[in-house]
Amino acid sequence: MKNYSLTKVPSQVQLELASRFREIRRDKKVSQSQLANKSGVSLGSIKRFEQTGQISLESLLKLAHLFDRLSDFDAIFKIDADLKSIAKLFS
């Protein structure tokens, strides 16, 4: 019997993110070389990201900015009102 998890592991998230990025790039008809020239991210970094999901945060943010997706990162580590209320209980 296999054990299944409803949560993803980081490597899964990386690969899914890379796949979605590649799809967006292709939909916009932008080559990897063009993207490297416009973003300041090296061609090697872009290729590695699309193949393995590995990229520095700075490079990922540059690429997101180029495709007007930088705001997608706003929700990461955002503390919502419920968490602030809970934190007050323990302070």
Task: Go through each PLM region and give its residues.
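A short, Lys/Arg-rich alpha-helix, primarily the initiator
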Residues: K2-D27, I76
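Short alpha-helical DNA-recognition segment
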Residues: K29-K47
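Short, highly charge-biased, low-complexity peptide segments
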Residues: A64-K78
